[in-house]
Amino acid sequence: MRAVVLNGHGGPEVLTFADIAVPQPGPEEVVVQVRATSLNRADLLQRMGFYPDPFPGEHEVPGMEFSGRVTAMGTRVRAWNVGDEVMGIVSGGAYAEQLVV
C-alpha cells in the first residue's frame, strides 16, 4: 500500500511516497480506504519537528483528518458495515491509502 511518509523533519522535501504494510483490523477496529484527507497546521508542525510524532517508528505517516469507505471489519464491530462511508480524525496515518480506526 502507498503512503506519504516523513523521512526526518524539515521542509516539504522530507515527505516521500513509500510502500508500507496493509493494515489489519483488530477485533474492534475497521479498515478505511481513504478517499480524501487534508493538510492542517498540526501536520505542518509535525513535518517541521515542532509537534510530537504520534507513532514514532519505521514509517511516520502524517495526516489527521480523513474520509473514505469501510473495507474490512474486526470480529466485534457492530456499528459499521463494509461499504459504509465514514469520516474522522486520527492522531496520524491519514496520508495512506488505507488506515485502521
Predicted regions mapped to residue ranges:
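Cytochrome P450 core scaffold surrounding the K-helix E-X-X-R motif
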Residues: 41-48
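Generic structural detector for well-ordered beta-strands
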Residues: 16-21, 100
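Short, Lys/Arg- and Gly-enriched loop/turn segments at beta-strand edges
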Residues: 93-101
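Short structural boundary motif marking the start of a folded domain
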Residues: 1-4
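Short beta-strand-to-turn element immediately C-terminal to the catalytic PLP-Schiff-base lysine
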Residues: 6, 47, 71-72, 100-101
